[in-house]
């Protein structure tokens, strides 16, 4: 079988490459061309290419999107939430001090966030490190409350799974722009714990704000209890 002419032109070069702030693809002529970006569309990868984050640690980073808007990106395994992520959530709650006017929480990964790192929580529980667990929960609650009442707009842009703590991050945002393929829910009961970053009260608030809810408090709250107790995701 003869080798196609295109592959002869390619040789040992990659079909795609990145240089500086641009991404390139190889044309049928064997030359590189800049990957076009549709007007009004962007990916975080385009912002990150050739730039340095405003703030960063092992779990998350804050990027400058331009026009006074920052983006918080979680980049742990499966975008799970650990102490590094919580620390960067706290940092994101004061980005106005660095001149930013708005915050977007999102990433280019398949999943927004699968929630807390259960493995770390299990390790701490088995070691009876109760003060550590209590402090972790408190810091997570405080971080999300700062975002909820931030003096600037906070937009969550979930795609894929936003479960447990990931869902609670979305619930803390002032606005949500969700991908069509998004799956959200407070699923902590599935592993034997209850939502700890404020998601329970956020669901209650939304249930009570629903003008079409049944009369009285309990009928509306029963739906919230059912959703949490059955680890429902939608």
Regions found by a protein language model. Give the residues of each.
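Gly/Ser-rich catalytic serine loop of serine hydrolases
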Residues: 156, 160-166
